[in-house]
Curated annotation (Swiss-Prot):
Keyword GTP-binding: yes
Coiled coil: none
Keyword Nucleotide-binding listed: yes
Localization, UniProt: Cytoplasm
One GO term (biological process): ribosome disassembly
Protein's UniProt name: Elongation factor G
Length: 692
């Protein structure tokens, strides 16, 4: 099968937004207009094309990023629908990694919301160009220019309208295009018929003002145009478009559009903007990686004649075809039935079938080309973030880093039959989601699952029940505490057993000191003159790493600690790797009395949006939860309280906030950093953990 769309006619985009800004509805409309679905599915009726897991349809939120392909004006647009809820930010990061551009959807009433900020920051980190779609222009309180101002105030983004709405709320009738200077009115309910007309008289002045602002902003992106502009010459439409495109692709400029996906207005113009202003795979820098086993840099340029290289960005279990691995091809082509190398794991994989996904049906294809997104069936060892490449030209593309889980709870199967199924099901879920971890507590024998927040784990337990038919009892959520030290000290660890026969002898002196926050464990070998032979030094490090997992105070992992091995002794016959491993762990135990160990707890960054009248009550509640209020700001007719609160105090907060604000308050929270636990509380935790 020959290539259908050239590289410059391909767009890989994501739709990103705050929860409920209308992201899935927007994606739906894109699929409708590009002829991929015949009937529009409404999210609030629970039947949308993109939200295909049962829970997504029930909760009306998007959890997994389904990847779909659509066609518009002889271009292919691959769309990844990303979740807007903070517990799923990893899904967002994962999809941003393989995109070339994104559409940020805002709610016209609220503008930039807390989760928009998080996702925007992630997109900036990965250098993803964006156009902004101000959605829900038909909603009461919709205000386009206010939404644009929030882009400047809250994100410091160089964003400029390239459209203006005609009317708002119930009177939202059409859209003015500030590049072509024409107006579009919508003739029928489905918005498929639009006609370009002259701008109505009452809007001409405003349109001219914003057209000039746009021209000035675009001229600043290009020196030649700036000269022309300063000399008072008119810029042509093509020059204006080219400048906006250049600025957008360089992540220096963000065009802002408006519309109402629900009312079918503005979506086709947004698709035009995706083609006009967002980059094709040829416009973004070639992806860099390195050759396995060496740190030599390798670059993979987009092109079908290049060696094959792709990144797996999502693994899911499908009830019909089994394990599906979604991947983005950066260079070269791949045929179904061929072999590739998973260079991350150094395994050979056979690609069984290749599917191009369309939200809920799939099309089998024989070849996938450079720049495309597809899903493979039959990969056994590949997980999220792995590189797939040509067996003769090996490369490892930069992979993704995922945060550690901050909350965990125990799950117990209700029956013996459930027990066997549960193990398999949890392993599958952990394979799909790198921020979900599962392990067995050796002391209690319980299965512990860990994730990024309460909603995250709720949904996992829900999936166990629905997809895998596993009934389980769920324990109360527990916080993942950490430990660290506050003082440096030199400590000895000596393990000697010499009572006839082969003995054991290991002896080390280690200096433990606090490391910078977030730096983790650092081991320094400071041995001179071979007082501890070279072959035993890895064992000292391994012994420390193991012992750090078991903690000093309450059995929680020790972080941000530096250990310098500077002295010790050995015995020609009795020393062994094992003996030095034990000696190192004994040194860490002895550090407890000298290094002032402390307990750390995860601090969450919390933003609560509440009507003014509940403000005092909500702030009092935050303080009673050991929270620190960092600031407040008015947002529309509501107040936003920003605070840091320990995760341990945030369980059940959703219910408490609902009852305090009669359901009108909303909040978002995500993990920010670790902080020392107050002494009285840490003593209780230590007591509880040592079983007193």
């Amino acid at each position: 099968m020959a290539r259908e769309f050239s590289l410059e006619n391909t767009r890989n985009i994501g739709i990103m937004a705050h929860i409920d800004a209308g992201k899935t509805t927007t994606t739906e409309r894109i699929l409708f207009y590009t002829g991929r679905i015949h009937k529009i599915g409404e999210t609030h009726e629970g039947a949308s094309q993109m939200d295909w897991m049962e829970q997504e349809q029930e909760r009306g939120i998007t959890i997994t990023s389904a990847a779909t392909t659509a066609q518009w004006k002889n271009n292919r647009i691959n769309i990844i629908d990303t979740p807007g809820h903070v517990d799923f930010t990893v899904e967002v990061e994962r999809s941003l990694r393989v995109l070339d551009g994104a559409v940020a959807v805002l709610d016209a009433q609220s503008g930039v919301e807390p989760q928009t900020e998080t996702v925007w920051r992630q997109a900036t980190t990965y250098g993803v160009p964006r156009v902004v779609f101000v959605n829900k222009m038909d909603k009461t309180g919709a205000d386009f220019l206010y939404s644009v101002s929030t882009l400047h105030d809250r994100l410091q983004a160089n964003a400029h309208p390239i459209q203006l709405p005609i009317g708002a709320e119930d009177n939202f009738e059409g859209i003015i295009d500030l590049v072509d200077m024409v107006a579009y009115f919508y003739e029928d309910d489905l918005g498929t018929r639009t006609e370009a007309k002259e701008i109505p008289d009452e809007y001409k002045e405003q349109a001219q003002e914003y057209h000039e602002k746009l021209v000035e902003a675009a001229a600043e992106l290009d020196e030649e145009l700036m000269m022309k502009y300063l000399e008072g010459e008119e810029l042509t439409k093509d020059e204006l478009k080219a400048a906006i495109r250049k600025g957008t692709c360089n992540v220096e400029f963000y065009p802002v559009l408006c519309g109402s996906a629900f009312k079918n207005k503005g979506v086709q113009l947004m698709l035009d903007a995706v083609l006009d202003y967002l980059p094709s795979p040829l416009d973004v820098p070639a992806i860099k990686g390195h050759v396995p086993d060496t740190e030599e840099e390798a670059v993979r340029k987009p092109g079908d004649d290049q060696p094959f290289a792709a990144l797996a960005f999502k693994v899911m279990t499908d009830p019909y075809v089994g394990k599906l691995t979604f991947f983005r091809v950066y260079s070269g082509t791949l045929d179904s039935g061929s072999y590739v190398k998973n260079s991350t794991k150094d395994k050979r994989e056979r690609v069984g079938r290749i599917l191009q996904m369309h939200a809920n049906h799939r099309e089998e294809i024989s070849t996938v080309y450079s720049g495309d997104i597809a899903a493979a069936v039959g990969l056994k060892d590949t997980s999220t973030g792995d590189t797939l490449c040509d067996e003769k030209n090996l490369v490892i593309l930069e992979s993704m880093e995922f945060p550690e889980p901050v909350i965990h709870l125990s799950v117990e199967p209700k029956s013996k039959a459930d027990q066997d199924k549960m193990g398999l099901a949890l392993a599958k879920l952990a394979e799909e989601d790198p921020t979900f971890k599962t392990h067995t507590d050796e002391e209690t024998g319980q299965t512990i699952i860990a994730g990024m927040g309460e909603l995250h784990l709720d949904i996992i337990v829900d999936r166990l029940r629905r997809e895998f038919k596993v009934e389980a009892n769920v324990g109360a959520p527990q916080v993942s505490y950490r430990e660290t030290i506050r003082q440096a000290a030199q400590v000895e660890g000596k393990f000697v057993r010499q009572s006839g026969g082969r003995g054991q002898y290991g002896h080390v002196w280690i200096e433990f000191s606090p490391n910078e926050e977030g730096a983790g464990f650092e081991f320094v070998n400071g041995i001179v003159g071979g007082v501890v032979p070279r072959e035993y030094i890895p064992s000292v490090q391994a012994g420390l790493e193991e012992a750090l997992e078991n903690g000093l105070l309450a059995g929680y992992p020790v972080i941000d600690i530096k250990a310098k091995l500077f002295d010790g002794s050995y015995h020609d016959v009795d020393s062994s790797e094992m003996a030095f491993k034990i000696a190192a762990s004994m040194a860490l135990k002895n550090a407890k009395s000298k290094c002032n160990p402390v307990l750390l707890e995860p601090m969450m960054k919390v933003e609560v949006v509440v009507p003014e009248e509940y403000m005092g009550d909500v702030m009092g509640d935050i303080t009673s939860r050991r929270g620190r209020v960092e600031g407040m700001e008015a947002r529309g007719n509501a107040q936003v309280v920003k605070a840091f609160v320990p995760l341990a105090e945030m369980f059940g907060y959703a219910t408490s906030l609902r009852s305090r604000t009669q359901g009108r308050g909303t909040y978002t929270m995500f993990f920010d950093h670790y902080e020392e636990v107050p002494k009285s509380i840490s003593e209780e935790i230590i007591k509880k953990n040592s079983g007193e």
